[in-house]
């Protein structure tokens, strides 16, 4: 897939209202944390590491899919903090909506 198209779909995730809302809520909730904050840097670091593992293991996942997963892997953290919902369950529900809206 062409790089320009890949970045367009990743940009759609970043600008999606649900992603932006959940990310902002998480940033506010973690503003006083010193370590292990779920910042954009964290999301992108995870994506970069996943991409390296993907190449080394010849797993065959697309760069677009890896970056989408990296951006969304902790998107349910705020709901976990506020409601006690396991973040992987909250995240799966939120990610499904975001990914569907972004034509994944």
Language-model segment annotations:
Residues 1-104:
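Metal-dependent phosphohydrolase cores
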């Amino acid at each position: 897939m062409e790089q320009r198209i890949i970045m367009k779909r990743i940009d759609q995730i970043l600008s999606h209202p649900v992603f932006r809302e959940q990310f902002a809520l998480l940033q506010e909730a973690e503003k006083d944390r010193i370590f292990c904050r779920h910042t954009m840097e964290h999301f992108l670091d995870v994506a970069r590491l996943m991409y390296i593992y993907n190449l080394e293991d010849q797993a065959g996942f697309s760069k677009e899919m890896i970056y989408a997963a990296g951006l969304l892997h902790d998107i349910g953290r705020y709901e976990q903090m506020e409601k006690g919902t396991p973040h992987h369950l909250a995240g799966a529900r939120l990610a499904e909506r975001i990914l569907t809206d972004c034509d994944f």
